[in-house]
Amino acid sequence: MKVILTADVAKLGNRGTLVEVSEGYARNYLLPRGLAVEATAGRLKELDLEKKRREKKENQELENARRQAARLDGAVVKITTRAGETGKLFGSVTNKEIAEAIKNTFQISLDRRKIDLKEPIKALGSYEVTLKLHPTVQAHLRVQVVAEGS
């Protein structure tokens, strides 16, 4: 029997996948638990439309990530913060502060989780930061940390 999965099922497939299973498995396990629906012509058409919509959205996200990477790759963001006499910061520069600096400088709103810091920034200086804009698109940004009043 052909069914369309409505949820991720271990060892069978992910949501939205068309799979062939035995009649008993479908009728006694998948269908009663709402893990799948019977594959009819209408549902197959609906599944195809959903896949096309999802592909279009993914392509738009990829194109948007590429545009952002083109603007941000090799760019420099300046962050001003309080520091002691020796150049050590009072606290550290976080992903959130870098995301705010990118938004203020380039008008690009970026989720802080997409910013990959190799180590915490705890001193003045220039640091290389990797931006993971999409699973296949990365950009490298230089963060320059300067003391207030300099």
Swiss-Prot record:
Keywords (A to Z) from UniProt: Ribonucleoprotein, Ribosomal protein, RNA-binding, rRNA-binding
Cellular component GO terms, alphabetical: ribonucleoprotein complex; ribosome
Any one Gene Ontology BP term: translation
A Pfam entry, by short name: Ribosomal_L9_C
InterPro entries given in the database record: Ribosomal_bL9, Ribosomal_bL9/RNase_H1_N, Ribosomal_bL9_bac/chp, Ribosomal_bL9_C, Ribosomal_bL9_C_sf, Ribosomal_bL9_N, Ribosomal_bL9_N_sf
Keyword hit for Amino-acid biosynthesis: no
Family: Belongs to the bacterial ribosomal protein bL9 family.
Function: Binds to the 23S rRNA.
Name of protein: Large ribosomal subunit protein bL9
Source species: Moorella thermoacetica (strain ATCC 39073 / JCM 9320)
